[in-house]
């Protein structure tokens, strides 16, 4: 292990330090860190709604044999409205808040008015957002949530750079020193704001004339090419979900066509075949086949703690990290990670645009998929013949999705151990990389930040 860590340090450490000081990458990282209160609050209520208030058929507690009467279930379902409202105000507006914090963080890197840049980023985001839902004059929630976060990232970075460009050229209104600072500050952002929002308004108008909008173009550019990879759908999903997440794109939502359109129907076909013949052996004897890439297989053996098998990362942090911030994030992310919700670790560490975590985050899922396929074709685990809740903890999900296979439970736990081992050396490297980045800012760094 020490040789592996030494090799990774030699290759990754200089690169990680250099990337860690890159203003745009740093702005994205710091922006997501500031979003963490929203992320954590939203994730907790997703957990409460999908696990602790769910007792109907197909729920976690139902799978454990716990049954409640219909009136109690209806009452609990009604209480989910509380968590739903919190979700709408947290994870449901991630794409709206991302440009504010990212634009603000980049403005701080550039040594210009951060608050003005952040506010203009939000205004620019809403300027290019269509105000129509059917016949109604309204903003669609789909533009504000996690599925559209790449738009928020792009707009936050672009607006902050435009703001910097304008301010550095003194295209601002300057008031006498006798005017209060708060008033002077507001007027200094007037001309930059007018120019930036005019540009965004023209872009929105032009795209609307062509029957589309900025957000839709971003989504189509991501989703359409990947959804066409039907022949290799399983591997495409396993590889591209974490890859998209690394760049701030909600991978699972971007590839919904593969999930809902192909892999979930495969799971339903497996269940129907199992129900018809009563057992996997009887179905195989009758010449029937089962789909290995059914969606619950991914949830059970690959997405351990969420995309990128981040429950393994949390465990690796507890084992190897000495960084107080990493350990605190891991503590906060563990409860939701156990139930397959990993936004706290994705945005809190963050993993997004983190150069040290790129390799393990993207590679861990294909490795776990290969192990799972090997176990399946060797006859160690049976195919998926049930659909347990996606929030089922690691091991239990595999057990229920295979209708009680202990071998499946053990393979899932083995995969979790492998994921932890994959992340371990990178957690150690991250410790040293951050120590180098956290050194006192030099005069040269300040001078570089002021360049455009």
UniProtKB/Swiss-Prot annotation:
Alphabetized GO MF terms: protein-N(PI)-phosphohistidine-sugar phosphotransferase activity
TM segment ranges: 35-55, 86-106, 114-134, 147-167, 187-207, 229-249, 300-320, 344-364, 367-387, 409-429
Induction comment: By GlcNAc2, GlcNAc3 and beta-N,N'-diacetylchitobiose (Me-TCB).
InterPro entries referenced in this protein's UniProt entry, alphabetically: PTS_EIIC, PTS_EIIC_3, PTS_IIC_cello, PTS_Sugar-EIIC/EIIB
Alphabetized UniProt keyword annotations: Cell inner membrane, Cell membrane, Membrane, Phosphotransferase system, Sugar transport, Transmembrane, Transmembrane helix, Transport
GO cellular component: plasma membrane; transmembrane transporter complex
Membrane topology: Multi-pass membrane protein
Domain notes: The EIIC type-3 domain forms the PTS system translocation channel and contains the specific substrate-binding site.
PANTHER family attached to this UniProt entry: PTHR33989, PTS SYSTEM N,N'-DIACETYLCHITOBIOSE-SPECIFIC EIIC COMPONENT
Protein name listed in UniProt: PTS system N,N'-diacetylchitobiose-specific EIIC component
Gene responsible for this protein: chbC
